[in-house]
């Protein structure tokens, strides 16, 4: 029999929720840190990390924790582990003895370990935390994906070759442009020099030779 999660149904929209938390004074709300997606190899052990920041130290008499599982976003939640003065493993038939608590609430760590992950374990794992007198409940959501085999390693050789080729091509283009620019500049300077010489020679011919004029 599935156990319902400790999760009161929200009575307001996501927009209202965002507005509500935006009005909470900085440092007064609980922050929960989890990976959005966790890829795990079939048959391996997976640590579902969940840590939190609170304004208050953890009092085990007041602190409470719930871990739940969902097959999909719209599916009902099944609670499989909780903390009430101590860790209580509910040992769902789905997980049996494969779930272990691996965190330490006093260190703001409430992570769990899932042994021998199976394809049926794929889904959403929710971490709910209450740490009175903090009035705000923390919530983290992890999407667990089970892989049938290890993903192939990315070969960076092709990327390096392409990058080097592009870089070399650009270097050659820049070099050619610089050479062309230098050649043009030299030609312009030579033309200016030739024009100046021609102008000076023209002036000399126009003035003539003073001795010839006397004769």
From Swiss-Prot:
UniProt cross-references to InterPro entries, sorted A to Z: Ig-like_dom, Ig-like_dom_sf, Ig-like_fold, Ig_sub, Ig_V-set, Myelin_P0-rel
Phosphoserine modification, residue list: 192
Extracellular side: 30-157
One GO CC annotation: voltage-gated sodium channel complex
Topology class, membrane: Single-pass type I membrane protein
Basic and acidic residues: bias regions: 189-215
Cysteine pairs bridged by disulfides in the record: 50-127, 72-75
Disordered as annotated region, ranges: 187-215
Residue ranges annotated as Cytoplasmic topological domain: 180-215
Domain (Ig-like C2-type): residue spans on this chain: 32-154
SMART domains found in the cross-reference section: IG (SM00409)
Entry keywords, A to Z: Cell membrane, Cell projection, Disulfide bond, Glycoprotein, Immunoglobulin domain, Ion transport, Membrane, Phosphoprotein, Signal, Sodium, Sodium transport, Transmembrane, Transmembrane helix, Transport
UniProt GO MF annotations: sodium channel regulator activity
Glycosylation sites: 42, 66, 74
Compartments where located: Cell membrane; Cell projection, Axon
CDD domains: IgV_P0-like (cd05715)
Functional summary from the UniProt entry: Regulatory subunit of multiple voltage-gated sodium (Nav) channels, that directly mediate the depolarization of excitable membranes. Navs, also called VGSCs (voltage-gated sodium channels) or VDSCs (voltage-dependent sodium channels), operate by switching between closed and open conformations depending on the voltage difference across the membrane. In the open conformation they allow Na(+) ions to selectively pass through the pore, along their electrochemical gradient.
Subunit field text: A voltage-gated sodium (Nav) channel consists of an ion-conducting pore-forming alpha subunit functional on its own that is regulated by one or more beta subunits. The beta subunit SCN2B is disulfide-linked to the pore-forming alpha subunit. Interacts with SCN1A; regulatory subunit of SCN1A/Nav1.1. Interacts with SCN2A; regulatory subunit of SCN2A/Nav1.2. Interacts with SCN3A; regulatory subunit of SCN3A/Nav1.3. Interacts with SCN5A; regulatory subunit of SCN5A/Nav1.5. Interacts with SCN8A; regulatory subunit of SCN8A/Nav1.6. Interacts with SCN9A; regulatory subunit of SCN9A/Nav1.7.
Protein name as annotated: Sodium channel regulatory subunit beta-2
Organism of origin: Canis lupus familiaris (Dog)
């Amino acid at each position: 029999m599935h156990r319902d999660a400790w999760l009161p149904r929200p009575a307001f929209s996501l927009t209202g929720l965002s507005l509500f938390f935006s009005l909470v004074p900085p440092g007064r709300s609980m922050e929960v840190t989890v990976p959005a997606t966790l890829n795990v190899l079939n048959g391996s052990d997976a640590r579902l990390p969940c840590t939190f920041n609170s304004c208050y130290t953890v009092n085990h008499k007041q602190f409470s924790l719930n871990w739940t599982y969902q097959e999909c976003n719209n599916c009902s939640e099944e609670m499989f582990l909780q903390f009430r003065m101590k860790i209580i493993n509910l040992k769902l038939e789905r997980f049996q003895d494969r779930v272990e608590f691996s965190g330490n609430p006093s260190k703001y760590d409430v992570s769990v370990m899932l042994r021998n992950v199976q394809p049926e374990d794929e889904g959403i794992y929710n971490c709910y935390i209450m740490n009175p007198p903090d009035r705000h409940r923390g919530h983290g959501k992890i999407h667990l994906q089970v892989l049938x085999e290890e993903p192939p390693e990315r070969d960076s050789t092709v990327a390096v070759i392409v990058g080097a080729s592009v870089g070399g091509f650009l270097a050659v283009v820049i070099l050619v442009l610089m050479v062309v620019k230098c050649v043009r500049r030299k030609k312009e300077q030579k033309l200016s020099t030739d024009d100046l010489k021609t102008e000076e020679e023209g002036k000399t011919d126009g003035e003539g030779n003073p001795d010839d004029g006397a004769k």
